[in-house]
Design a protein with these regions (language model features):
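Active-site segment flanking the S-adenosylmethionine/decSAM binding pocket
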Residues: 72, 111-164
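Conserved SAM-binding motif I beta-strand of class I
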Residues: 86-91, 159
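Conserved SAM-binding loop of SAM-dependent methyltransferases across substrates and taxa
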Residues: 72-84
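Class I SAM-dependent methyltransferase Rossmann-like catalytic core
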Residues: 15-62
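Conserved class I S-adenosyl-L-methionine
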Residues: 61-73
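C-terminal substrate-binding/active-site "lid" region of AdoMet-derived donor-dependent transferases
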Residues: 96-97, 139-211
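Short beta->alpha hinge that forms the Motif I/post-I loop of the SAM-binding pocket
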Residues: 70, 91-94
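Short, conserved SAM-binding/catalytic segment
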Residues: 99-111
Length: 211
């Protein structure tokens, strides 16, 4: 019971922080950082090599790809380099949406931009060959519950979060994995320079749906 209460409290705290984030401005800096008004990092340019690896994973068959949370657009730029069939982006923050519009993301022939919270549009989404999820200060628990419904057979899903215990809670039980055909694999960036960053700080993982 206490574990359930603690999880519920963590979820509510995460929800409050995410709402606060969406209601405040963010700033894009010249040195490729995305910051909150009090200079908290939302996304940093040094994440680039990890985003490159993540894009390679989800673009495994150059099919239909979804990214939730645009940020600096690092992974979306790499997704475009794979010349995928369809590239969907969900972004909820108004300032990031404006940056995307100014940079012409909505004009790319294979890109569909959904300027909304994922909770408002997920039931209208098609199935994808690859999915990446990285929103700021938001619990991933709810999104992870719908991942199996959004993936095609053989599809791959990656995410990046500093709160590993909360993030992986949905996937801990064998019953869940058997029911949804999920195989969980540890994944660390192939770039040795970022090995310790991704392993120790972010616990970066790959989850792939079986054929």
């Amino acid at each position: 019971l206490m574990n359930n209460l603690n999880k519920h409290t963590e979820y509510l705290n995460s929800k409050d922080k995410h709402i606060e984030y969406l209601n405040n401005k963010v700033y894009f800096t010249k040195d490729n950082r995305l910051l909150t008004p009090n200079a908290q990092p939302v996304m940093m340019g040094w994440e680039d090599p990890i985003m490159k690896d993540a894009a390679s994973l989800i673009c495994h068959n150059k099919g239909k790809i979804l990214n939730v949370g645009f940020g600096l657009g690092l992974i979306d730029t790499y997704i475009q380099s794979h010349q995928v069939q369809e590239h969907w982006i969900i972004e909820a923050h108004p300032d990031v949406q404006n940056k995307m519009k100014n940079d012409g993301w909505g004009k790319k022939s294979n890109v569909t931009c959904l300027f909304n919270k994922w909770q408002n549009v997920y039931d209208e989404l098609p199935k994808f060959d690859g999915i990446y999820f990285d929103t700021w200060k938001e619990s991933l628990d709810l999104f992870h519950k719908i991942v199996p419904n959004l993936l095609k057979p053989g599809g791959k899903y990656t995410y990046w979060s500093p709160n590993d215990l909360e993030v992986h809670s949905v996937f801990k039980t064998n019953e869940y994995k058997v029911e949804n055909g999920i195989t969980k694999l540890d994944y660390i960036s192939s770039n040795q320079k970022y090995y310790n960053i991704s392993k120790d700080l972010f616990n970066y993982k790959l989850i792939t749906k079986k054929l």
